[in-house]
């Protein structure tokens, strides 16, 4: 009896359903039919993949000029979105050197990158001085572990990591890239340090 009921049910289904493509197993292959979607009916779903936004060329140029170091303000000001910045940091493509300061090439930061980082933390008028400037002027042979940065007297910064901030009321004009104290000032500072 069970066999008879199965046959009747199959006969009814065959009468009411249109002929569907069949798989090799004899099952309907309706799931394999691709129906083009109307683009106007697409909705956003969580987890949907979006094309990655690239880093703006101006930002890449600035990073190259600054030994692969950028501030958060520079990145956002030159067109990077907060979400792209977040992705670069979470995927460790960019690494933080300090709060709001990033190394952008995915490798360990070089001394030059750390020097630029200190200048950027120090602000618009900051410049390398003493042994750090002496190293860049090629009168101090080895890059110093502590990078000394000259800042205006009114700027208050705590020394941190490899950076020592030295305040002065008589800030000389900087030169070079990264900004550093002029050669005569650097020589005098090094003579006084010894």
Sequence positions of predicted segments:
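Short gly/ser-rich loop at a beta-strand->alpha-helix junction or flexible surface loop bordering the NTP-binding
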Residues: 2-194
